Amino acid sequence: MQDIINPIDRALLKAELTKEKRLRSTNKSKNEIYIVTAHDSPNVMQEIGRLREVAFRYYGGGTGFPVDIDEYDTMEDAYRQLIVWSPEDEQILGGYRFLCGSDVKFDENGKPILATSHLFNFSEKFIKEILPYTVELGRSFVALEYQSTRSGAKGLFVLDNLWDGLGALSVVDPSLRYYFGKVTMYNTYNQEARNMILYFLGLHFPDADQLITPVYPLETNMDVEKMRSLFPHDNFKDNYKVCLLYTSPSPRDPKT
């Protein structure tokens, strides 16, 4: 496990966050949304990589390298980085990386070159009918010091600010209809809560057309009969309440 790099000098960050890279102001907390790449903002990219590694290591993940930056961040047609910037604190508060379907390249076998290509098989229907109108999202993070409500309104609204930015993408490009990406659940996550979330999503949002299937199917210790008893309702709203009840920060024990 290598040491994480020191924070990038704020003057270098501000020099790269120029007017043409600004997407919009946030609805709350008076922050700014910027879109950058590793090529046009190398110092910002280093700070993004540092913040990712800090946040992901804290929860049991991370790359183990000084920064979390991979080939998809740095390749010729690199993924773009959407970040929340605090003009007041002069800090990056959070971010996503993304690639619009219209910008996706394909390999010699016709397989889309995506950060998730090693995880998923994509059907022809998805590639032809869905992907061109889709934004692939990944590497989402909130800077560790802004993940607690103790950081005040800025911390409370960082996720809201990020969603402002994601929503703005479809305003800039009205052809975008879908958002797609993977969700990471670390081994440290409560397994019972994880199983409930997975069951709930499968119950109400099944992929009947098999648009995307996992290369390595997820194996769980899920007790399906128990899950059925925990989610007895035939509608989303009531089952969602059950899911929240058991998977909130201080969840009830489903065994009781």
What are these regions (language model features)?
Residues 2-39:
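Conserved N-terminal entry element of GNAT/NAT acetyltransferase domains
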Residues 97-150, 194-219:
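Conserved acyl-donor/pantetheine-binding loop and adjacent beta-alpha core of acyl/acetyltransferases
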Residues 211-245:
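A conserved mid-domain beta-alpha-beta active-site/ligand-binding segment of alpha/beta enzyme cores
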Residues 246, 251-256:
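Single conserved hydrophobic/aromatic residue that forms the stacking wall/gate
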